[in-house]
């Protein structure tokens, strides 16, 4: 059996959106003749503690862990945060933050930790893996980012050993939605772009999760790019199935950063409640996961405070129950320059439940390629008020069958084809 080294920052019991792609694929790869070896930090900053994910780690997979030094505790102490507080991505703050300390810490983090706060792990990892791979050779390496420091490890190994290397971009690097907020100096911006270009040009293959982003990566210099979307694992669906809510629940799963806010939607929903008291009596807006304070405030300002339910951060297993029990699932595409290619991993889990999915974002974007059939709908922000009756009809729409194109089994076959062609 061939061997592939997968270098990933996220691995169980660490939860969050970054862990699922290669956790699920590594479970399936041995069935196609590829034995994964996982290289991951021993002591990472936890996004979410979710030990339930360990059930997806195959007992026959070797997991190599090495210590990592990160600056997050210094950052937390300097800004007055608790050392137990999770560091959010995408400028999400559940409570109001402010002051010069926050601004200065962001400036330091953005300009001195390039490409990201895991940069101190690059050199020791390259040194360790060069020795490890001489004793335990592999046929290919896959690095997955963000954090893009994982790609810098792959670049170092490629240059030192000439091993076949796939760089997997779950999110863009310099085209990430919050890049403009990083307060970069010209020198730091140039360094980001130089390192990104080196990775894109020197990797044997670049993978990404959406079609628009593939085009963007080609423009940035990638010599060979393939799209392998995220997917769903039918084994994650609750057993027995979660009953569908009696009320009209509109449920968003996952983090809600400021760029995902949709004031037009909150106003359209309030209008529906005002126009139809029977609908209002049954309507609930449920946020499952961390929510930026500006969004919660915006929902209340729109007059939907009495309809809002929040659960906070929960495990993946609990999140799947909320998905399956929702009347309608809500996907909010970030209102940012790279919005056309945003295709979140949770979208495919949404589809697996058979529940209607309301996508709020560009109709011409990649989300529409997945939500291309009823009972799903994609509506851009300016059109939400005008199409509010269409939204209301979704709460009584029949369920659908999940499309097998988006299963993890299908995406794993694509990964195997890519590995075999290296």
Feature locations, PLM:
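Carbohydrate-associated surface elements
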Residues: 212, 231
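Nucleotide-activated donor-binding/catalytic signature segment of Leloir-type glycosyltransferases, i.e.
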Residues: 282-289, 294-320
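Acidic donor-binding loop of glycosyltransferase active sites
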Residues: 204, 307-309, 323-340, 395
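N-terminal subdomain of nucleotide-sugar transferases
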Residues: 1-72, 205, 225
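A charged, aromatic-enriched C-terminal amphipathic alpha-helix characteristic of glycosyltransferases
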Residues: 381-389, 395-421
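Conserved donor-binding/catalytic core segment of Leloir-type glycosyltransferases
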Residues: 243-260, 266-269, 411
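A conserved catalytic-core segment of Leloir-type glycosyltransferases
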Residues: 40-119, 123
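Membrane-proximal helix-turn-helix segments that form the acceptor-binding/catalytic region
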Residues: 130, 149-152, 156-160, 173-174, ...
């Amino acid at each position: 059996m061939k061997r592939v080294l997968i270098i990933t920052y996220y691995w169980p019991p660490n939860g969050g959106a970054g862990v699922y792609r290669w956790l699920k694929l590594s479970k399936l790869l041995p069935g196609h003749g590829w034995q994964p070896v996982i290289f991951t930090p021993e002591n990472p900053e936890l996004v979410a503690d979710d030990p339930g994910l360990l059930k997806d780690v195959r007992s026959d997979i070797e997991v190599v862990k090495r210590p990592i030094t990160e600056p997050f505790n210094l950052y937390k102490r300097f800004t007055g945060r608790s050392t137990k507080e999770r560091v959010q991505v995408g400028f999400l703050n559940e409570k109001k933050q402010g002051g010069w300390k926050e601004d200065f810490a962001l400036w330091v983090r953005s300009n001195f930790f390039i490409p990201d706060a895991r940069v101190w792990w690059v050199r020791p990892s390259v040194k360790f893996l060069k020795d490890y791979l001489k004793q335990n050779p592999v046929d290919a390496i896959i690095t997955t980012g963000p954090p893009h420091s994982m790609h810098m490890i792959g670049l170092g190994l490629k240059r030192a050993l000439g091993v076949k290397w796939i760089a997997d971009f779950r999110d863009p690097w310099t085209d990430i939605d919050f890049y403009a907020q990083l307060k970069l100096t010209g020198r730091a911006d140039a360094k980001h772009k130089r390192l990104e270009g080196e990775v894109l040009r020197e990797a044997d293959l670049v993978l990404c999760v959406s079609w628009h982003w593939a085009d963007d990566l080609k423009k940035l210099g990638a010599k060979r790019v393939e799209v392998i979307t995220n997917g769903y694992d039918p084994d994650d669906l609750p057993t027995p199935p979660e009953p569908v809510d009696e009320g009209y629940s509109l449920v968003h799963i996952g983090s809600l950063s400021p760029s995902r806010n949709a004031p037009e939607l909150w106003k359209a929903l309030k209008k529906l409640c005002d126009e139809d008291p029977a609908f209002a009596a049954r309507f609930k807006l449920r946020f499952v996961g961390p929510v930026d304070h500006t969004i919660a405030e915006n929902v209340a300002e729109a007059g939907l405070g009495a309809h809002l339910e929040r659960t906070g951060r929960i495990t993946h297993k609990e999140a799947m129950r909320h998905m399956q029990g929702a009347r309608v699932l809500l996907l909010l595409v970030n209102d940012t320059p790279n919005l056309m290619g945003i295709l979140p991993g949770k979208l495919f889990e949404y589809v697996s439940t058979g529940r209607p999915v309301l996508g709020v974002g560009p109709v011409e974007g990649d989300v529409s390629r997945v939500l291309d059939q009823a009972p799903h709908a994609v509506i851009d922000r300016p059109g939400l008020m005008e199409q509010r009756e269409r939204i209301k009809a979704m709460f009584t729409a029949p369920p659908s069958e999940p499309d097998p194109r988006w299963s993890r089994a299908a995406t794993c076959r694509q990964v195997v084809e890519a590995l075999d062609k290296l």
